Amino acid sequence: MLTRRTFLKEMAAGAAFFGMAATAPAQTPAARPNIIFIMADDIGYGDLCCYGAQKVKTPNLDRIAREGVRCTDAHATASVCSPTRYSLLTGTYAWRNRDGDHILSGVAPLSIPHGAATLPSLLKQAGYATGMVGKWHLGLGTKESPVDYNGVIAPGPCDVGFDHAFYFAATGDRVPCVFIENDHVVGLDPNDPIRVRYDAPFGDEPTGDQIPDRLKIKADKSHSQAVVNGISRIGYMSGGRSARWVDEDMADTFTK
């Protein structure tokens, strides 16, 4: 019977095995293949040219499909942000854990249980160096010790198997709008601490529904709270101005 733990181990060990098999005839030292898994929100089966799309050109992803494996049959029990990431990293149905079966806020605790076997932790056991870049959205801190963006941020990605992480906590449209490297906010001025919550605004900080004419993007009802970089977000945030990202520069930041 293929259990969750067996599945994750076979994924980790299998990648190393195929790397060794490719070099065995030449009697050279075993080499492990690099593994890059790209998860992109809001991209459907018909959005890539390699699957027949025409409106938006996707040459880099088309090349990956051409040089790798292109799947044509996939299923998802929860096709939204946090549950998808939870299942990918743990090999577990997200609905088996009430902390991982819904879209999380930027102040939610880590949804992956302490000590759980994860794909990156098993890859590390197989000799890989592991890292993640981009959207995290699996929670930070614990219920007993909520995340403090002004101090050490833990537990987080580096506590579930990643050697290095450069990421943002929730989503691009949710606060806090700052980058985190491993366990600290990047570029934070300690004299301008970050405050984050989702139930009420901070003092006289403007919200999107209050200043609609000053926004870069028209706000809808759900995106009408904190304003960062001229864009109205979900949730409320104050402080951390030196650490706030610029949306237009985000792609360049992640690819440096």
Please provide the spans of the model-predicted regions.
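Formylglycine-dependent sulfatase
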Residues: 2-256
